[in-house]
């Protein structure tokens, strides 16, 4: 069993993009930014506990930070981890709250 304190630190934020919106509409899949050291089991447990939905699958990937330039200096954004969480048929998460 994963401690509740850890579950609250696993999910960082929902990741909103054109690709994630299409995935949500067509495949009932929600995309989250998650902690870099989190596992698929932790992500599944966190989503089920926090949002009270049933998860059928979790796919994770590491996103490399982009190199950015400010004047003559180059810097690099941080690497981060993304999780595609597939929900059971009939389950739904709404982050926008019906705003249209």
Swiss-Prot record:
The protein here is known as: Large ribosomal subunit protein uL23
Please tell me whether the keyword Signal is annotated for this protein: no
Q: Which organism is it from?
A: Pseudoalteromonas translucida (strain TAC 125)
Which family is this protein grouped under? Belongs to the universal ribosomal protein uL23 family.
Query: Gene3D superfamilies from the xrefs?
Result: 3.30.70.330
Q: What does this protein do?
A: One of the early assembly proteins it binds 23S rRNA. One of the proteins that surrounds the polypeptide exit tunnel on the outside of the ribosome. Forms the main docking site for trigger factor binding to the ribosome.
Which GO molecular-function terms appear in the entry? Answer: rRNA binding; structural constituent of ribosome
Q: Name one GO biological process term.
A: translation
| Disulfide-bonded cysteines | none
**PROSITE patterns linked to this entry:** RIBOSOMAL_L23 (PS00050)
Subunit structure as annotated in this protein's UniProt entry: Part of the 50S ribosomal subunit. Contacts protein L29, and trigger factor when it is bound to the ribosome.
Q: Which GO terms describe its cellular component?
A: ribonucleoprotein complex; ribosome
Q: Which UniProt keywords apply?
A: Ribonucleoprotein, Ribosomal protein, RNA-binding, rRNA-binding
NCBIfam families per the UniProt record, alphabetical: PRK05738.1-1, PRK05738.1-3, PRK05738.2-4, PRK05738.3-2
Fetch the InterPro entries from UniProt: Nucleotide-bd_a/b_plait_sf, Ribosomal_uL23-like, Ribosomal_uL23/eL15/eS24_sf, Ribosomal_uL23_CS
Which N-terminal stretch is annotated as signal sequence?
none
């Amino acid at each position: 069993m994963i401690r509740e304190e850890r579950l609250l630190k696993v999910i960082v934020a929902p990741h909103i993009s054109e690709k994630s919106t299409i995935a949500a509409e067509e495949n009932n899949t929600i995309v989250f930014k998650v902690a870099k050291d989190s596992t698929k089991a932790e992500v599944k447990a966190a989503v089920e506990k926090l949002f009270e939905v049933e998860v059928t699958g979790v796919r994770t990937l590491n996103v490399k930070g982009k190199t950015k330039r400010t004047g003559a200096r180059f810097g690099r954004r941080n690497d981060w981890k993304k999780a595609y969480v597939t929900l059971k048929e009939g389950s739904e998460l709404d982050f926008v709250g019906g705003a249209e």
